């Protein structure tokens, strides 16, 4: 009985100390469609919009984030993407906001 208790205790300790393995997911944002963006098929639109904002801000050497404008732009992009599901989301950004 004491061997079983010791074994179970050791097993619980071992399992408790093992960190959960997290899968690393790689995305090619240039291939995300509006359908995937607006349909929450990859992640939330906000997460993708934050990345897009950083990407285009970096191209302009802009280090400031206007959080209100980011939210408004995300909603504008979502509305556009709902109406144009087959377009790539980066092309949608370039069409709506004139980014290149």
Predicted regions located by residue number:
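Bacterial N-terminal signal peptides that target proteins for export
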Residues: 1-8
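Solvent-exposed, flexible loop/coil residues
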Residues: 5, 33-36, 41
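Bacterial N-terminal signal peptides
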Residues: 9-16
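Short, flexible active-site loop motifs that bind/organize anionic cofactors or intermediates
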Residues: 13, 24-27
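Sec/Tat signal peptide C-region and signal peptidase I cleavage site
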Residues: 18-23
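Compact alpha-helical subdomains of small soluble proteins
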Residues: 26-27, 40-100
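Acidic/histidine-rich, surface-exposed loop or edge segments in extracytoplasmic proteins
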Residues: 30-35, 56
């Amino acid at each position: 009985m004491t061997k079983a208790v010791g074994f179970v205790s050791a097993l619980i300790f071992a399992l408790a100390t093992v960190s959960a393995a997290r899968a690393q997911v790689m995305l090619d944002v240039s291939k995300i469609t509006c359908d995937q963006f607006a349909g929450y098929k990859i992640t939330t639109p906000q997460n993708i919009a934050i990345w897009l904002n950083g990407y285009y801000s970096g191209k302009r050497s802009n280090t400031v984030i206007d959080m209100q404008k980011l939210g408004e732009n995300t909603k504008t992009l979502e509305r556009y993407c709902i109406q144009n599901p087959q377009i790539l989301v980066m092309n949608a950004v370039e069409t709506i906001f004139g980014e290149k």
